[in-house]
Amino acid sequence: MPREVKKRGRRAAAKRAEEEKEDVDLKVYENDEDYVTFDADGGVAGGHDDEENDGYDNETPYNPLDLKQMPFFGFLDDQESEYFKTAESTLAVDAFGSPEEKLGFISGLLDEARGKELKLVTNQICSKLMERLILLANDEQIRALFEVFSGYFVDLSRHKYSSHCVETLLVRGAAIVEKEVLDPNFDGDSEDSMEKRFLTLANDMKDYIQDLISNPYASHVIRVLLLILGGQTLPSPTSSEGNSSVLRSKKSRTARRNIDIKDSEENDRAYQIPGAFHDALEAIVSGFSKRLKPTAARELAIGQVSSPVVQLLIDSEATTSEQRPLLNTIFADTEDRDSSEEAFVEHLLSDAVGSHFLQNVLQKAPEAFVERLYRLYMSQRVQKLVRRDYAGFVIETCMQRLPEADVHHIIDTAMGEIPYLVENNNLTMVRILLTRAAAANYKATDVANAVLKTFDTDSTDPKLLQKVLQLDEKNPYKPHEASSPGLHRCLVLQQLVEASPEVLATAFVGLNSGDVDVIKMAKHQSYSRLLEKCLRPSINTIERRKFLNKINGQCVDLARDPFASHVMDRLWNFTYKMNNFREKIANELVADEDLKENTYGKAVWRNWSLDKFLRRKSDWWVTLHATDDALAKEYEELGIPLDAKSLANPGQKRFGRGGARIITRGGGTFPRGGGRGRGGFRGGRGGAPRGGFGGSDRGGFKRANGGDGEDASGDRSRKKVRNE
């Protein structure tokens, strides 16, 4: 007879044994009266063989929470499961003929799910359906779901699938609370109010906070609850902008993006809340801090799952209590050095999670607290701390909060460690040092020169860009990983370019050399940002022409790229007073009829005002000149007059009755402001009328290849340009 197909090998055998161990018979309970919890072995939690004992100790409250006990609400039968899976697919496709049809479908689904909600939210596929329904339900349907989940929130929050539904339900509920607060006719004391439901939920959660914040699923629910009770902004669960890390880690946000469920409109905003919410938040924070001893509190503070919630509790404490009991439990409430606190701080400075916790605390703690920690445990050890991978972020935060004298001491001490940091690829600390020195206006040039010296270069070296980036000879433009040394070298160079105009000018010369491919750099996820930093209108005009000639004919391709499209956006300002280049780029972009259909090309089209360029070109020129005027004013406030900075080099100024003029390499002149007629370009000895191209080989520039912008010798840098 046929034999059962089995996987061979010890790993497969071990996996089968594990599955058989977990394969237990679970009784299906059809109503809430039969609901019980099961332990890790599949048995009834607290059950005994003694028939006289019902398995529960009614004298002891359900606290602390046994994390091994997981809720079980039964299974759907095959027919129900198939029906709801099909419904989930229908909602995901969203191919309804009208909004009314969709609303009717949602109402029918909620009616069909009545009595089965707890089974649905704990099912892998059906929980996605319930989350979609929660997002699409009206206010009355949200209230009804709150009522169904009431009494089960603690257990549902700990479940892998239902926890997402609880989070979404809380966000939808917060929007309803705001409506009730803003409605003058609403009775806030009504038992049907969403405010009462939230207060009941907060009271149920209060006694289990210590256990829930250590659960990988419930911790996210607690974060949402704390943000709502505190009236803080609720970040999007998928966005990486703003304070999104308060709600989810980067890994968690990525996982949520992979689920095809759109964010609720209630995300990314704060809500008006009743005063009772502040009282509930204070009760949670004070109750949590009173039950904890310093050792337990510190363990939670460095826990990978619990640490973000403890940070949020400390932030919430600042608005509910002036005494800061939780902060004073984790850290010693004394001015003197404490041995246990010293060991704890040492661990924080050496640990990834701990350093993030300490950084967050120092950002929002009172200045006296920051100065005390720095004075007792860090001031004498700056030289060692800057060498650590994780302590650098803490040092950065200290430099933002400490007095000027302490900041100067850190910079002076850390400068001597720059060679060690570069040699060991700890370039994060190098970037921090560059940033803070510039912000403090203290030895910023000295720090930049020390960094360049470590890379065996200086601000006048034409090979500066190549020496700092250290491009791989075999594959110089391979994608960078998050921890790639190439990425961090690129970030260091960006910081140097930001800090020093001399480094900017020298690095741009490197871009125009034949050693780098600017097209590939523009399409690189890291180097494209470096290009954006370098594309400034203060760059010498001749160097700008060289760069623009390098990308000639590639603009459409760059505009369609997710990274290079940002470079194309920067070209609008980069081409200051180079109107013919702007017009040439615009013509190249509008020649591609499908560019607007591309996601990135559409953004470039909008930023270059190409609709105006096609329909009302005069308006486009007005926009262009307004941009130039704004840029000139902006750079003048920075002490960089763009006309003199960008047009004077490498020639010299000539003053006369006609105003300031620049002598070009070829001997021709043009006015500083640009224009037509008498102020136009003059060619060689004969010149050319009205700003045309000169015909003399010696003094002027020739049109070559039918006016494509190259002279007869093929030198693309010697290109004659006419300002419109």
UniProtKB/Swiss-Prot annotation:
Its main location: nucleus. One of its GO terms (cellular component) is 90S preribosome. Residues 665-698 have a biased composition (Gly residues). GO terms for molecular function: RNA binding. Residues 235-247 have a biased composition (Polar residues). SMART domains: Pumilio. One of its GO terms (biological process) is endonucleolytic cleavage in 5'-ETS of tricistronic rRNA transcript (SSU-rRNA, 5.8S rRNA, LSU-rRNA). Pfam families: PUF_NOP9 (PF22493). Keywords: Nucleus, Repeat, Ribosome biogenesis, rRNA processing. Residues 1-23, 39-61, 235-258, 649-724 are annotated as: Disordered. It comes from the Eukaryota. The keyword Nucleotidyltransferase does not apply. It is found in: Nucleus, Nucleolus. Belongs to the NOP9 family. RNA-binding nucleolar protein required for pre-rRNA processing. Involved in production of 18S rRNA and assembly of small ribosomal subunit. This is Nucleolar protein 9. It comes from Yarrowia lipolytica (strain CLIB 122 / E 150) (Yeast). The lineage of its organism: Eukaryota, Fungi, Dikarya, Ascomycota, Saccharomycotina.
